[in-house]
């Protein structure tokens, strides 16, 4: 920044470029806002929760958490550690059918919302 006694600092070119990048709204953000505003995001969250329970994924994650706690000792495990250890396994084990159904619903929403 260039400073002056008589006027506020003039931003450098790099600062201006960074400002433009911060102002850009991504397509992902637009879709997320529309999903929230319409209430469809909550519907999708409920759909995913139901499908993960139906396929046994939730039970698998509960078992994985319990095994990790048992292995490390109840007093030596924090919630943050449990999340750090279990999250990659959980994400990798979401069935493709659940991912496909969610993607299909999002695509249909985008088409119907004319985004």
UniProtKB/Swiss-Prot annotation:
Quaternary structure annotation from Swiss-Prot or TrEMBL: Component of a deubiquitination module (DUB module) formed by ENY2, SGF11, and UBP22 in Arabidopsis. Interacts directly with SGF11, but not with UBP22. Interacts with MOS4.
Keyword entries, A-Z: Activator, Chromatin regulator, mRNA transport, Nucleus, Protein transport, Transcription, Transcription regulation, Translocation, Transport, Ubl conjugation pathway
Name listed for the protein in its UniProt record: Transcription and mRNA export factor ENY2
Family, as annotated: Belongs to the ENY2 family.
Statement: the UniProt record of this protein carries the keyword Transcription: yes
Any single Pfam family the record assigns to this protein: EnY2
One MF term in the entry's GO annotations: transcription coactivator activity
Function as written in the Swiss-Prot or TrEMBL entry: Component of a deubiquitination module (DUB module) that specifically deubiquinates monoubiquinated histone H2B (H2Bub). Does not seem to be a component of the TREX-2 complex. Seems to act independently of the SAGA multiprotein complex. The DUB module is responsible for the major H2Bub deubiquitinase activity in Arabidopsis.
Native species: Arabidopsis thaliana
Lineage, opening ranks: Eukaryota, Viridiplantae, Streptophyta, Embryophyta, Tracheophyta
PANTHER family linked: ENHANCER OF YELLOW 2 TRANSCRIPTION FACTOR (PTHR12514)
Any single Gene Ontology cellular-component annotation: transcription export complex 2
């Amino acid at each position: 920044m260039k400073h002056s006694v008589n006027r506020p600092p003039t931003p450098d070119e790099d600062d201006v470029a960074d400002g433009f990048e911060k102002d850009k709204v991504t397509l992902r953000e637009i879709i997320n806002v529309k999903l929230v505003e319409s209430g469809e995001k909550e519907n999708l969250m409920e759909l995913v929760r139901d499908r993960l329970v139906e396929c046994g994924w939730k039970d698998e994650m509960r078992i994985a958490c319990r095994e990790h706690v048992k292995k490390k000792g109840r007093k030596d495990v924090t919630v943050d550690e449990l999340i750090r250890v279990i999250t990659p396994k959980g994400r990798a084990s979401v069935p493709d059918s659940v991912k496909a159904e969610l993607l299909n619903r999002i695509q249909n929403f985008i088409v119907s919302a004319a985004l």
